[in-house]
């Protein structure tokens, strides 16, 4: 392809015009296609979340590269494996990844992907072998890549958790923490395994001590709030923790969490104020507001305010088109529950 063609493609990529990229490449004769074009076409589909066409694009070019067919096919099988994993078809994803391995690929990325697949397929011991191999490979290939190390240590910890080996799980989670991971996922998995090894009260003390030494850590405050709320039903302490989480990071999720604690305390008017603030942030960030709308409807139902309950019920109904197919039945059930409660007012 000439320089003018690639300038146009680059411009379309920068502007996020992926449908136009697809049209431009689809105009080309089949004998003009090469690995670069196939990769651009596949990525355009991926950016549009059209994973089926992305997969078919890669599969269609296997064995057709004009140069270095083996390495081209390794890349294509690897991409196919990754795409299948993205749509949670781990069995098929594993098959493609193993094809890439048969052709000679044996690096950290491939072993990590295979390890994840095996874990998702309940072949946990095999998954651990692959991920531990990844740790060895990364020390050779990319020893300074802390983010990859954090990910692999976290995955190993998670697989040990699946095996109910909390001591080993904690060992790897602590390493991920020491390397710099600081998020709700890690904190809650630490909680799960600490609870199993030392009990709820001692596990709670661990988090209380952590927050004493790092009291501006919004993620840690949120995790502590979840523990107070979901494990101990201590809504008062949970509300304080979520309030601190928002204080140190203006994340609307923390407001939503705080509203749930306030609802647990039956402080519905305060919960409404917090939910409206959370909803405003969601709108500003162009995110869905269905979670806030559902809880706002619940609050107004509790206050026997039918007019406002119906107002937010309508927002909940409008939001159904944005719900992923995987969660649609649960969403419809929530909608029916709200309608039933409002009809009883």
Label every PLM stretch briefly.
Residues 3, 36, 71, 75, ...:
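Start-of-helix register in tetratricopeptide repeats
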Residues 7, 40, 79, 113, ...:
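"A position-specific structural signal for the A-helix of alpha-solenoid helical repeats
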Residues 10, 43, 82, 116, ...:
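Residue-level recognition of tetratricopeptide repeat
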Residues 14, 47, 86, 120, ...:
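Register position in tetratricopeptide repeats
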Residues 18, 51, 90, 124, ...:
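TPR-repeat structural position
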Residues 26-32, 62-73, 102, 136-149, ...:
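Flexible helix-coil transition and linker loops at the boundaries of alpha-helical arrays
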């Amino acid at each position: 392809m000439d320089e003018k063609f690639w300038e146009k493609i680059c411009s379309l990529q920068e502007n996020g015009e992926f449908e136009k990229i697809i049209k431009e490449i689809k105009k080309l004769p089949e004998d003009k296609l090469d690995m670069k074009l196939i990769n651009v076409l596949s990525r355009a589909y991926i950016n549009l979340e059209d994973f089926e066409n992305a997969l078919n694009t890669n599969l269609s070019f296997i064995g057709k590269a004009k140069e270095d067919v083996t390495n081209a096919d390794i890349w294509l099988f690897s991409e196919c494996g990754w795409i299948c994993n993205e749509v949670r078809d781990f069995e098929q994803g594993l098959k493609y990844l193993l094809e890439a391995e048969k052709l000679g690929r044996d690096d950290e990325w491939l072993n990590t992907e295979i390890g994840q697949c095996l874990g998702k397929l309940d072949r946990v011991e095999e998954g651990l072998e692959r991920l531990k191999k990844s740790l060895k490979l990364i020390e050779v290939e990319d020893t300074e890549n802390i983010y990859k190390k954090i990910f692999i240590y976290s995955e190993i910890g998670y697989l040990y958790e699946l095996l109910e080996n909390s001591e080993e799980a904690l060992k790897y989670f602590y390493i991920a923490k020491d390397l710099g991971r600081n998020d709700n996922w890690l904190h809650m998995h630490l909680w799960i395994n600490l609870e199993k090894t030392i009990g709820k009260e001692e596990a709670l003390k661990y988090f209380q001590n952590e927050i004493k030494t790092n009291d501006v850590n919004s993620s840690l405050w949120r995790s502590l709030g979840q523990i107070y709320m979901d494990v101990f039903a201590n809504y008062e302490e949970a509300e304080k923790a979520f309030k601190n989480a928002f204080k140190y990071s203006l994340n609307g999720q923390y407001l939503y969490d705080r509203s749930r604690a306030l609802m647990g305390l039956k402080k519905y008017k305060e919960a409404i104020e917090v939910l409206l603030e959370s909803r405003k942030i969601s709108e500003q960030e162009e995110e869905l507001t269905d979670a806030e709308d559902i809880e706002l409807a619940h609050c107004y139902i509790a206050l026997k305010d039918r007019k406002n309950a119906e107002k937010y019920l309508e927002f909940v109904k409008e939001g159904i088109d944005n719900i992923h197919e995987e969660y649609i039945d649960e969403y419809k059930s929530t909608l029916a529950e709200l309608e039933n409660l409002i009809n009883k007012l």
